Amino acid sequence: MELILLEKIANLGNLGDKVNVKAGYGRNYLLPFGKATAATAANLAAFEARRAELEKLAAEKKASAETRAAQLAELEVTITATAGDEGKLFGSIGTHDIADALTASGVEVAKSEVRLPNGTIRNVGEFDVAVHLHAEVEATVRVVVVAA
């Protein structure tokens, strides 16, 4: 399935690239979320007419993500959870909990932007958590988990 990307997609291409993807990826993700459009002659002409507008919009999104990254770089978030004697949590701290704590501290973060490559946090301690704000912008936040 040939598509024209309407924004930068990690590991796929940049704005305006004509890419060939599997049909399911195109139909179920790229097209419904407005990240791409079918590569027909009419859509190519329409895209070229809107190219400057889309590039400006992409630059604004990146600038917004960079300002949020600068705010996040200064933050250290403390999350309180119940834990046993050895520091093992009863339950875990996931992306939703971290996103809520960051939003409460003043920076709007969606749970889908928080990256926990090793899974949820299950122990008391300090952790560096990656926050993926944009295809080109990633910030690291220090999360401190303390026992209640």
From Swiss-Prot:
Please give the superkingdom of this protein's source.
Answer: Bacteria
What's a Pfam family this protein contains? Ribosomal_L9_C
Q: Does the keyword RNA-binding apply?
A: yes
Q: Name one GO molecular function term.
A: rRNA binding
Q: Which SUPFAM superfamilies match?
A: L9 N-domain-like (SSF55658), Ribosomal protein L9 C-domain (SSF55653)
This protein's GO cellular component annotations are: ribonucleoprotein complex; ribosome
ATP-binding keyword on record: no
GO annotation terms (biological process): translation
Q: Which InterPro entries match?
A: Ribosomal_bL9, Ribosomal_bL9/RNase_H1_N, Ribosomal_bL9_bac/chp, Ribosomal_bL9_C, Ribosomal_bL9_C_sf, Ribosomal_bL9_N, Ribosomal_bL9_N_sf
Classification via Gene3D superfamilies? Ribosomal protein L9, C-terminal domain, Ribosomal protein L9, N-terminal domain
The alphabetized UniProt keywords are: Ribonucleoprotein, Ribosomal protein, RNA-binding, rRNA-binding
Instruction: Briefly state the protein's biological role.
Output: Binds to the 23S rRNA.
Which family does the UniProt entry place this protein in?
Answer: Belongs to the bacterial ribosomal protein bL9 family.
Q: Could you identify this protein by its name?
A: Large ribosomal subunit protein bL9
Q: What organism is recorded for this protein?
A: Pseudomonas fluorescens (strain ATCC BAA-477 / NRRL B-23932 / Pf-5)
Gene name, per UniProt, is: rplI
